Amino acid sequence: MKQLSFLPGEMTPQDRRLIQRALRALDRHLHEPGVAFTSTHAVREWLRLHMAALEREEFRVLYLDNQNQLIAHETLFTGTINRTEVHPREVVKRALHFNAAAVILAHNHPSGETTPSQADKTLTQRLVQVLQLVDIRVPDHLIVGGRQIYSFAEHGLL
């Protein structure tokens, strides 16, 4: 099986079309009735395909209902090559707009390094705190760096 390049300048048009088809298929799967995020595998693959080749940091939120089914997803903030300013108030506002019971947070590190910075850890703690005030759970915060993904939940940081 051919390895896909995740560097934007190295992707062939064929690779881009293949990724777009995979994203559409995963999107359809994630929006099927009854599909719950009991396993993070599909979420990770979806995020990897969406975010691995981005040249600037993006902060995304996946909004889930009480059964952990996807309600909606969106990019809330876009930053520079090594930083994104995230406003907790906006995250809460959008989660309430979608009537979410839980949110999965995600952002990318264009450098490919997935280890969270102290700023990442502080932001995550702050978001968990403010979302708890309105009874919204945060099952995970994922950092995408190329083909690698770091999970705050798996590392005991949530």
Swiss-Prot record:
Q: Membrane-spanning residues where?
A: none
What are the recorded GO MF terms, alphabetically? metal ion binding; metallopeptidase activity
Q: Which Gene3D superfamilies match?
A: Cytidine Deaminase, domain 2
Residues that, per the record, bind Zn(2+):
107, 109, 120
Q: Which CDD domains match?
A: MPN_DUF2466
Task: Provide the MPN domain boundaries.
Answer: 36-158
- One matching Pfam family is RadC
Q: Which family does it belong to?
A: Belongs to the UPF0758 family.
Descriptive protein name: UPF0758 protein YkfG
Name its species: Escherichia coli (strain K12)
